[in-house]
Amino acid sequence: MEAVIKVISSACKTYCGKTSPSKKEIGAMLSLLQKEGLLMSPSDLYSPGSWDPITAALSQRAMVLGKSGELKTWGLVLGALKAAREEQVTSEQAKFWLGLGGGRVSPPGPESIEKPATERRVDKGEEVGETTVQRDAKMAPEETATPKTVGTSCYHCGTAIGCNCATASAPPPPYVGSGLYPSLAGVGEQQGQGGDTPRGAEQPRAEPGHAGQAPGPALTDWARVREELASTGPPVVAMPVVIKTEGPAWTPLEPKLITRLADTVRTKGLRSPITMAEVEALMSSPLLPHDVTNLMRVILGPAPYALWMDAWGVQLQTVIAAATRDPRHPANGQGRGERTNLDRLKGLADGMVGNPQGQAALLRPGELVAITASALQAFREVARLAEPAGPWADITQGPSESFVDFANRLIKAVEGSDLPPTARAPVIIDCFRQKSQPDIQQLIRAAPSTLTTPGEIIKYVLDRQKTAPLTDQGIAAAMSSAIQPLVMAVVNRERDGQTGPGGRARGLCYTCGSPGHYQAQCPKKRKSGNSRERCQLCDGMGHNAKQCRRRDGNQGQRPGRGLSSGPWPVSEQPAVSLAMTMEHKDRPLVRVILTNTGSHPVKQRSVYITALLDSGADITIISEEDWPTDWPVVDTANPQIHGIGGGIPMRKSRDMIELGVINRDGSLERPLLLFPAVAMVRGSILGRDCLQGLGLRLTNLIGKATVLTVALHLAIPLKWKPDHTPVWIDQWPLPEGKLVALTQLVEKELQLGHIEPSLSCWNTPVFVIRKASGSYRLLHDLRAVNAKLVPFGAVQQGAPVLSALPRGWPLMVLDLKDCFFSIPLAEQDREAFAFTLPSVNNQAPARRFQWKVLPQGMTCSPTICQLVVGQVLEPLRLKHPSLRMLHYMDDLLLAASSHDGLEAAGEEVISTLERAGFTISPDKIQREPGVQYLGYKLGSTYVAPVGLVAEPRIATLWDVQKLVGSLQWLRPALGIPPRLMGPFYEQLRGSDPNEAREWNLDMKMAWREIVQLSTTAALERWDPALPLEGAVARCEQGAIGVLGQGLSTHPRPCLWLFSTQPTKAFTAWLEVLTLLITKLRASAVRTFGKEVDILLLPACFREDLPLPEGILLALKGFAGKIRSSDTPSIFDIARPLHVSLKVRVTDHPVPGPTVFTDASSSTHKGVVVWREGPRWEIKEIADSGASVQQLEARAVAMALLLWPTTPTNVVTDSAFVAKMLLKMGQEGVPSTAAAFILEDALSQRSAMAAVLHVRSHSEVPGFFTEGNDVADSQATFQAYPLREAKDLHTALHIGPRALSKACNISMQQAREVVQTCPHCNSAPALEAGVNPRGLGPLQIWQTDFTLEPRMAPRSWLAVTVDTASSAIVVTQHGRVTSVAAQHHWATAIAVLGRPKAIKTDNGSCFTSKSTREWLARWGIAHTTGIPGNSQGQAMVERANRLLKDKIRVLAEGDGFMKRIPTSKQGELLAKAMYALNHFERGENTKTPIQKHWRPTVLTEGPPVKIRIETGEWEKGWNVLVWGRGYAAVKNRDTDKVIWVPSRKVKPDITQKDEVTKKDEASPLFAGISDWAPWKGEQEGLQEEVASNKQERPGEDTLAANES
C-alpha cells in the first residue's frame, strides 16, 4: 500500500503541480475503495478498466452523502494516471517507429494500457509505471529501423511479415507539460537514414511514387527540436510535416523554423505580421490533418488551441457544404470516388486515425488544399479573438506629429484589425481624410481622384508639403523663432537676475520696449508736469508714487512684486495662446472698468483700462502697467503663461475683481467676477473666460474683427405655479474635503460666467460627488424649485429611428459641449436658482451665487435645450431640405447624399451653432467609418446597438425594472421576441423597489440568447429606391412585426415591432394582429414618411377570403399590395406559430350532448351533470382555495373535455363564464386564471362547442331549468343545514348561538348568517372578551398618544402603561409620527425595561413599516385593538385621563391656569410621573414602582369551568387572576393562559382535591370567597360528590342570573 501511495503521489506532483493531493488523502481514498470492494489490491489502480467504475461509485457517494473529498482526490489521481499513460504510449510508439526497440503499444484507450511490472521512484529519476516492454526498448540495438510486428502481421498495414511499410504514426501528446517523452532522451542521433533533407535547407527533388512503395522518409529530429524549444517552453513537443506536390511524401521541417516561430509567437503575439508571415510560409504547401493539429499545438496555448479546433471545424463544414452542392468540387476528387466528409477532412476516417502515412495515401489533393486553407483561416480568427487589435478608429494625428508617423500608426492598427483585406485600403484612405490635421485634410481633399492607394496618398502629401505656401501656422512659427530670443532674454533676467557686462541689462525697457537700457534711463520717460507733486511712497517732491525709484529698485526697473503668502486656492492649468499682432485699426479693443472687491484698504477701488479681446486666450491677463500697485497678487500652481514667443511669468489677483465692459453709449455691460492673471505683457487681454461670462464673442465678418453680444432672445422664460412663494432650504453641512472641492468648482463656474453673485431670497442646497476619475462633480438639489415650476410639454416624442437614414449616405456626428451652459437663463428667473457656499465653522460670511445659464437638474432644462437648438437649426433645415439632420438633446447627426455635400453642410451647421453661442467639441466630431450615435453604431448599410454586458447584476425589483427598460430600448433594433422577454416580465411583479430578486435559470438562458442576438442581428438602413415592406406573424407569447425590404427573399429589417401586453382577460389572435398591423402602418408613416408598399400577411388569410372584418378595418385606406404567404424566415428567432381562424364556440345549440355546470362558494365545489337515459350523471371537482369564478371556469372546462371530438352544449348560470367563453370563439391570448383554464380546454377540442346561459332558480319549467337545478343541488349539497339556518333566521332573527344549536352548524357559520342579514347587521358583531393584561411586569404594555393643549407647542404626549404594575412613562412630542413613537418606546425601555408585547391602536405611527422594523429589531410583539373602539385600550385611556388631571392640578398649583411656559413643561411633566409612579393609587398597598420591580409570585387558584362559544361549560381550568369583570385562567393540561370575562367563569366543584387549595391562594383571589355562587357550591360539595349524577339545582339559577 505504501509503495503504491508513494508512486501515485510522485505522479500527481509531476502532472498536477501545486494542486496535487497529499499522501494522506491518497491513502484515505485507497482505503475507501478497498472497503467498498472497488479494488482488490492497490496495484489494481493502474488498470484502466477500473477507472470508470471508481468514478461512478465516488460520484454516486458524493451525491448521496454530500461528501466530495474522495471524488476530488480521485479526479487529480485519474488525471495523473492518464497523463503518465499517454506519455508512456507516445514514447513507446516513437521508439518503435524510429527503430530503437520497444514493443507495439496500442493507440490511446483505457483498454490498451499495460499494467506496469515495476514502479519508479521519482526522486531517483526512474520511469513511472515502467513496463517490461519499455525496459526492452532501452536495451534494443540502435541500428534497428524496421517496423515491429505483433503476431504474424505487420502493425502498419496488417499484411504478413516482410512488408515494405517504413513508418507509422506517433499520436500527438494530448497533455501539456515540459517534461514529456523522457524515454526519447538522446534519440536524436539514432533516427532513420536516407530520407529527405530538412525543410529550410537545400532539398533535392523527390521522385513521385505511391505512399506504400516510397522509401522511408526521414522524420524530424525530435531530440534536437526539444533541445531548441527548451528555452522558449512551447506547450507541446510535436513536429508538423508537409506533403510535397510531387506525391504523398513527407518533408521534415527544420527544427530552427519551429523554434523561431514559437519564439515569434511568444514575443510578438499571434496578430503580429511577422507571426502571420511565418505561419503562412509554413502552411504554403498542403498539410495533413495530423500535421496541422501538431503545428497548432506547438504555437497555441491550451485555450487558443480549443478555440482553433472549433473554428477549424466550422471552416471544414463550409467546405463540406460546398462539396455537397457541387459533385465536381476539388474536395470530391472531380467527381471520382466517394464524397468528402468531416471525418476524412479531420483525419478520423478508417485507416487515418493516428496514421499520417495513411492520411497521405487516402486523402485527395483537393482535400489537402481545403484542410490547409481552412486551418489557416481558423488560425486568423483565433488570433483576432485571443489578441484583439487596438481601436484604429480612435487614432488621430497629433498637433506636432508628422504625417508619416501618423500613417505608420494608422496602417499598423488597420492591418492588425478584423477588417477584411479588401476593405483595409479604403479605410486607411478615409481615415487620412478625417483623422489627419486640418491642413493635410485640405490637401487630401484636393488630391486627384486617380490616387486610390494609401501609398499614393502618402507620396502626394509629402510632395505637396515641400511646396506648400506659407500658412497662418507657418507665420506663427516664424514669428515665434524671431521673437523668442527677445522674450527669453526678459524671462531669464526676471528669473535669474542676470545682467550683461558692465552692469547693463540684457532685457527690454518697460517704457519703450527697446533693449540696452532700463526704464529709469529711458529717454522717452514721461516727466512729471507738477514739480511740487509729493510722492506717497518716499514723501519726496517732484514725482508721484508710480515714478518713485524706491518702488522700482536701484536702477528704476521694476523688480518682482512682493508676493502674499499662500498658494492660489484654485488648481488650474492655464495654457494661453496670445493673439497675433494685428494692425491697430483692426485690433478689437474695449474700455474696461476693474473694481477690487477685497476688504483690505487700497488707494483705488476702481480703475479704467483698455483691453484687447482675444478669443485665442484661455484666461484673462491684466498687464502690470494697468494693474494698481497696492492690489495684492499671489503665486499660482503654474507660474508661467505659454505663448508663441515662449513662457512669461504670471501671478494671480488675491482678491476677486469685478470686470465690466463700457459700451459706446457709456452704459456698463453686466459685470463679471473673476481672479485675473497679472503678467508683464504689452496691453491687457480679455480671454475666453471673460468673453463667455460677458456674453461676448469674437468673430470674423468680411475680414474685419468685431465684437458681438450673444442675443438674449434665446432665453425662454419659465412658467411658475400661482403659489410660487420663495423656497429657502438651508445648505447642508459638508466635510472639509468636499467643501474645498465645492469651492474650487464654484470658482471655476464663476470664472466661466455660468454663475453670478446673488442676494436672492431663494436658496437650495448644493453638494459634490466623486466621479470614477477621482475628480468631483457639482450638483444642485432643485427638487423644491421644480415643485414650483409648471413643466413644459414634451417637444420630441422619443428618439429618432436611425435605420431610416438612406442607405449608403455618409454620416457626421456633432456633440454640443456643455449645451445647458451655453443657453442663458431668463433674467427674471435667475434668483430662483440661488445657492450658498458655506465656510467651516462659519469663519466668514457665506457667499451666495445664482445660475445665469440652464442649471442641470431643473425639470425644464432638457425641453428648453431642445427648443433653443431646434430654433437655431431651423433656418438650415429650410435651406437644405435634402439634408437629413437628426437632433436629440445635445447630439446632432448629419447625413447627405455625398461626402462633399456633407462636409459643406457640416461646416455651415458648425458655424451657425458657434455664432449662436454654442461650442462644438472638435475631438467629438465623428465621421464614417465607426460612427456612434445614441448608443448605436452606424455603418454605411447597418445600424447595430452597442454596450450589452456579459451578465447584469440583479438583486432587487428596481434592478429588474432598469434591465427591462434597457431591453425595451434595444427591442426595435434587435428584434427580441416575446418569449425571451417573458422571464424578465415575470420578475416585475411587486410594489416594493427593494424587494429581493434573483438571477434565475430562465433569465440566464434568455439573456444568453439576447447577447448572442446582439452579436449577429442589426438593422439595415433604408434604401429609398426599393419598396418598403411590412410583415406580421404570431409567435410564442405574443405577436411580432417588422418593417424592412426584401422580406420574402433576402430580408433586410429596418424596424421591429411587437404586440402590447394584453389588458383584457382574453384577446383573440385576430385582434392582436389587427392592432399590430395598425401599429405597423403608423410606424411606417412616422419613421419613413410613407405608407408600406407591400404588406405580408400570414397564410391563413389566403385561405379565408374575404378578409376578416378586423383586418379590413386595419387596412382601411391602404393602397399598397397585400400578399399572403408562409411565415418569412426572418421570424425564425421568434418561433412563429400558425394562426387559426376557425370558430370554436357559438351561442346557438349544436347537435350533441348537453351538460349543466355550477359551482358553490360555500362547499367550494364545481359540478358537471348530464342525463344518461332516466338518470343524471355527475362529476365533481373541489378546491377550497379557488374563487367561485375559477370553480365555474374549471367546471365548464371539465364539461368541454368530456367529448373533445363531439359537438357539445354547455349550459351554465354564470354570466361571467358564458361571456368569456363566447369571446374565446377563436384562438387568442389569455391573461387571467379563468381564461387560461378555458383556453387550455378549448385547445384540446376539435369539435364545435355551444355555451348557453340560463338564470338560476327561475320558475320557468322545462329541461334547462331542471338540469340547472340538479347541478345547483349537487354543488350545494352540504349547504342544506346552512339554508335552513338562513330560513330560520329570516323568520325569527335569532342569534348565532341559537342558530348553531338549532341547525347543527358551527359558530362561525352561524355568525356569517347573522352578518348577512341587513336588519341584524346594523352594528358589527363583536365577541365577548376582555383586555389581555400581563401576569407580571414587562409582559404587556399599552401605548397611546394624547393631546394636552397646556403643553403647546409640543402638546402631544406619548403614554405607556405596564398592564401588570400600572407604571407609567410619558414623553413630549411636537407631532404624532413613527419617529416619535420609536423615541418614546426607547425612553420607556430605558426606564422600565424591554417588554414582550405592546398593544396600541391602529394609528399610522404604530403600524408603519419603519415602526414594524424597529419593533422587530428589539424583539417585541405588537398587536392593535379594534379600530374606532377606545375600550380596546382601556388601561392606557385611564392613564391618559389620570395624567392630564395630575398635570392640570400641578399647573394650577404653580399659577399656570392655561398654557404652561415651555421652560417649565419638562419639570412639571417629570413631577407628574413621579407622583403617579412612586405613591400608592386608590386601594393598592404598593406603589406601581414597587409592583414593577418586586412583583408578587402568582400561584394557581381554585379550579373553575369556562363557557366556550357553543355555550357549554368546559372543565380543566384554574384561576390565576381575578379582577373587576375579568379573570385570567390557566389550563391544567396545556398550561395555556387566557383572559375571559368574569361572567363566563364559575367554580368547578367536581375537583375535590383542588378546593382545599382555596385557603392557600394568593391574596389576589381573596374576593372570590365572598362570591355567592362560590359559597353555594362550597356548601353543596358533599351532596354533589355523593350523588354525582344529578345536576346541581343552583346552576340553573346561576344561568338565569347570567342571562
UniProtKB/Swiss-Prot annotation:
Its EC number is 3.4.23.-, 2.7.7.49, 2.7.7.7, 3.1.26.4. It comes from the Viruses. One of its GO terms (biological process) is proteolysis. GO terms for molecular function: aspartic-type endopeptidase activity; DNA binding; DNA-directed DNA polymerase activity; RNA stem-loop binding; RNA-directed DNA polymerase activity; RNA-DNA hybrid ribonuclease activity; zinc ion binding. Residues 1333-1496 form the Integrase catalytic domain. Residues 609-690 form the Peptidase A2 domain. One of its GO terms (cellular component) is virion component. The record marks 155-156, 166-167, 177-178, 239-240, 476-477, 479-480, 488-489, 577-578, 708-709, 1280-1281, 1567-1568 as: Cleavage. Capsid protein p27: Self-associates to form the irregular polyhedron core composed of hexamers and pentamers, that encapsulates the genomic RNA-nucleocapsid complex. Assembles as a tube in vitro. Binds to inositol hexakisphosphate (IP6), which allows the assembly of the polyhedral capsid. Spacer peptide: Plays a role in the oligomerization of the Gag polyprotein and in the stabilization of the immature particle. Essential layering element during tube assembly. This is Gag-Pol polyprotein. The gene is pol.
